[in-house]
Amino acid sequence: MLELGKLLTALIAPPLNTFVLLIIAAIIYCVHFKKLAKFIAIISFTWLYIMSAPFTGLLLTNNDDSPALTLDEYKQAQAIVILGGGSYQTKELYAETASGAPQLERLRYAAFLQKETGLPILTTGYSLIGISEGDLMAKELNQFFNVPTQWIENKARNTEENASFTKNILIKDHIQKIILVTNQWHMKRAKYLFEKQGFDVLPAAAASYGSKGNLSAKSFIPDLGALNSNMVLLKEWIGYWKAHYVE
């Protein structure tokens, strides 16, 4: 079911949906429905352009409407929860597996918050390669930031499981009010799913994907960076709608 959901999401966004639509258009063209084939091809390239243009990021980026919080407010929490954000295998000397950019951004912010608040940390996340994200984050927090980890959750495969499995751990210590650390583009969905589990969530959003600022001529010129960030943002909106309205 998890893999089916990922496939359906991939079919909505380029480049897979562009490829699929062009194959469909070619088949239809061969059976002499040429106008319909041309229409499908136009739709395919239009959607590819929209998803590749920076202006789309302006529309999708502002998906976290949580207010900015102060350190005094964060100090009212009982624990800090860091969500896994991806890892990769490396030839760097310090480890065989390392945190990817989004996960490292989360670790950096969480380390700062822990040193300012003194709160215990829980890391959560599974991985298909090598060490789990939960274990890897705990290791890197200690190795690079000299910050300890109180709890490690290493089975969660998605944000919904992050929330559910975290509850199973923290409920034993009667912890309900948490600082939730993830990237800005992921926060809206993550916050909703953790609140659904009964947590009182103080959002702590790390660095963000997407375009910021005002529209300019450059905003309408497609580029690969915009395609990548727009796909991430679209995936998050789809995930939020699915969690909020379907489940």
Swiss-Prot record:
UniProt xrefs under CDD domains: YdcF-like (cd06259)
Main location: membrane
InterPro entries xref list: Cell_Envelope_Assoc, DUF218, Rossmann-like_a/b/a_fold
Assigned keywords, A-Z: Cell membrane, Membrane, Transmembrane, Transmembrane helix
Domain of life (superkingdom): Bacteria
Ranges that cross the membrane: 11-31, 39-59
Location(s), subcellular: Cell membrane
GO cellular component: plasma membrane
Membrane topology, from the record: Multi-pass membrane protein
Protein's UniProt keywords contain Transmembrane: yes
Record-level GO BP terms: Gram-negative-bacterium-type cell wall biogenesis; peptidoglycan metabolic process
PANTHER family to which the protein is assigned, alphabetical: ENVELOPE BIOGENESIS FACTOR ELYC (PTHR30336:SF4), INNER MEMBRANE PROTEIN, PROBABLE PERMEASE (PTHR30336)
Name of the featured protein: Uncharacterized protein HI_1701
Species per Swiss-Prot/TrEMBL record: Haemophilus influenzae (strain ATCC 51907 / DSM 11121 / KW20 / Rd)
